Amino acid sequence: MTKYILSVDGGGIRGIIPAIILAEIEKRTRKPIAQIFDLIAGTSTGGIVVAGLCKKDEQGKPKYSAQDLVDLYQKYGSYIFRSFFLRKAIAWFNGAEYSHKNLEYVLTRYFGEDTLSNTLSNLLLTSYDIDNHCPFFFKNWREDRNLIKLKDALRATTAAPTYFTPKYLKINQINRVLVDGGIFANNPAACGYASGKRLFPNDDITILSIGTGTSERTIKYSSSKRLGKITWVKPLLDVMFGSSLDAVDYQLGEVMGDKYIRIQSQLKIASVEIDNTTAKNIKDLKQEAQMMISDNQRLIEEFCQVVA
């Protein structure tokens, strides 16, 4: 038997791209995403997408469709990444660029007080514990973690350094200071594969991994010589998040062959900035998503026919 794993990358407001692609898959299969996949993994904004698709309603069915998550980005993207000039200026030296309160408001609005146990499928969210120097995974199938509130797990996986403050949680009597899982697994497909092999040891595995778009942006040698400690931060984060995508693609491509399906492309018109929430950029991101669907038409159609 084949088990299907969904993996969704991080990328801030660019999370609208995988949400649109998943809405297309729900439309073609006439099935909710949580019914198609046996394990669903997400990092950062990808965590919001997958958790939204796994959240149960009162009848035990999916609370949100992928289109509902598209609407979330359109309605609340600019609210989450709302800042003021003074805060941005201070953030270069001390503190995060954006207030966590806006993000937490949106997470509470969509996920309430529900815990990881109140989800469908097997859900995996990534984060990194900067206090204990180790990755930390939120897994709804683990009894020692499934009573953590979804909004707290999502606050942790979206705590991108310099953008939002870390999330403090006490879990099983251990103090944890958690930040965005993108610092080690911006594409969480390998994390999903490892968990899938443990959960389904006797089954074949197929992974659908959806990206949020990449950029050609580089750091030229002449520019890098002039960067100081402070101005290195954002470019370094871009390199760190981007390099992990390439590594996972190579590794899973070698191990799984055509059982690893990757939908990703270079952004052609939209901004790569994770906090660019202008109306124009959101419109451009939606257009990028449609181009990704068009460019991967055969892959998507074949996958939908198999799982429908």
Each predicted region: which residue ranges?
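Conserved catalytic cores and adjacent C-terminal regulatory segments
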Residues: 1-308
